[in-house]
């Protein structure tokens, strides 16, 4: 049986566990596994781009729903203005008080992004960031992971189920399976990102 949807995953998990009395628990095991792989995977399929306008005098803005990690951020100006990460302490130290201008730095605190200096006008900032995969449910029956890496879902869900079943001897088996599935997926995605070409670093003059 192919594992390519929420329902086929639940059926496969029940079959592999040889249990027919876990229909209420299996969705919980799936959700726990989703929390795990969203923390560790950083794939191209997780990348999103969003454009937001700043407001003059407003220093902080909400991060997008599902935000996991920043990949790149810049102001959509001509030429493009790079915005560099700073720790919160450094951001406050440099731009304390009422200083304002075109943002050149940012920091993340909680679920907000803070700019320094405080924007003095409306600037469009463009974020490329990693977003959590959408969770599977009865109304959202597929996502990228279940279609492209069903082993991550299967092994991870089985791993979450075994402690509930007090079947500790099976935990290392599913743990190894999940670890290998995640490692293989991340390694292949890293290779595909560069299409087999050598990674080069641009110097300060803009040349390789």
Model-derived regions: residue spans:
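Glycine-enriched, solvent-exposed interface loops adjoining structured elements
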Residues: 1-208
